[in-house]
Amino acid sequence: MTTLTLAELATITGGELFGDPTALVSAVAPMDKAQLGHVTFLSNPKYSKHLGDCKATVIMVKTSERELCPSNALVVADPYVAFAKVAQALDSTPSPAHGIAPSAVIAEDAKLGHNVSIGANAVIESGVQLGDNVVIGAGCFIGKQARLGDNTKLWANVTIYHKVEIGSDCLIQSGTVIGADGFGYANERGEWIKIPQLGSVRIGDRVEIGACTTIDRGALDDTVIEDNVIIDNQLQIAHNVHIGYGSALAGGTVIAGSTRIGKYCIIGGASVINGHIEIADGVTITGMGMVMRSIEEKGMYSSGIPLQTNKEWRKTAARVHRIDDMHKRLKALEKLLEQSDTVQPDNSQAE
């Protein structure tokens, strides 16, 4: 178990400590459950009313909440960012593997860097290159000529197909498959003809990929994930997709082939993105967004019907089905109004 002094926390977060610099913490906890030895944080001012009852050893807050803290206070610019840094420093998550398991199958010509760990029943095929401090969990498969950079970690049962390239400091969760064939077929008189997927997948540095996500290899060019991208669980990323630097994609999202997503984009959960389109840098798509055409300007985009009671939703759905009929009736009314405007009144009989 890692233990840190509050002085060390101040160094890690860049914050200003008000209190005992020698006090010790060993874990992070939510404000309402924190006890002695815990560090907690306040990022939303509406919860400041609970500060007085908090029992944590130290609370990370902004300047405006410091006087409300009943114990040691660590004043930081962004308490949530500070929480992330402290959680990393105190992280006690076990490693997927230690050393090289006797049951691991490793090709004779595979190149392993210093301090590599490979778990039980993992398979490392011919021509694979693993950088320094790489960790391969139990049951992983690393295909021929794949390359993994320094400090990259794979949890159990990750599959990396042949010639896939993964950068340094990446983290891939269990069940993810990278480099399977893209969905490429030609149709000749009703018969499907498979198109060999001759490209690969290139993943940059500091990329994190959640559990059971699939990233397909390119048909001719590569599928590309740039540096600092974070990808949640259970996404489908099709062949030749390109995801730009620093983007974040939430769970359940499906991206069709050859779409290009810009830098610093945020894609909400369960979104569906059409193929062969481009999304500009800095675009945010809210959850369950359906993107059918390119987005050329940064900003926030939404689609779909927000949650309603079932009764309200049924009424809304009924209205949606009547839109075409209502449109026709409206056009007919507009035409009648136009015709009535063109008819001039006959005032000759009034004299």
Curated annotation (Swiss-Prot):
Residues of the active site: H239
Q: Which reaction does it catalyse?
A: a UDP-3-O-[(3R)-3-hydroxyacyl]-alpha-D-glucosamine + a (3R)-hydroxyacyl-[ACP] = a UDP-2-N,3-O-bis[(3R)-3-hydroxyacyl]-alpha-D-glucosamine + holo-[ACP] + H(+)
User: Organism's domain of life?
Assistant: Bacteria
Q: Which UniProt keywords apply?
A: Acyltransferase, Lipid A biosynthesis, Lipid biosynthesis, Lipid metabolism, Repeat, Transferase
List, in alphabetical order, the Gene Ontology terms for molecular function in this entry: N-acyltransferase activity
Enzyme Commission number(s) from the entry: 2.3.1.191
Q: Which PANTHER family match?
A: UDP-3-O-ACYLGLUCOSAMINE N-ACYLTRANSFERASE, UDP-3-O-ACYLGLUCOSAMINE N-ACYLTRANSFERASE 1, MITOCHONDRIAL-RELATED
Under which name does UniProt file this protein?
A: UDP-3-O-acylglucosamine N-acyltransferase
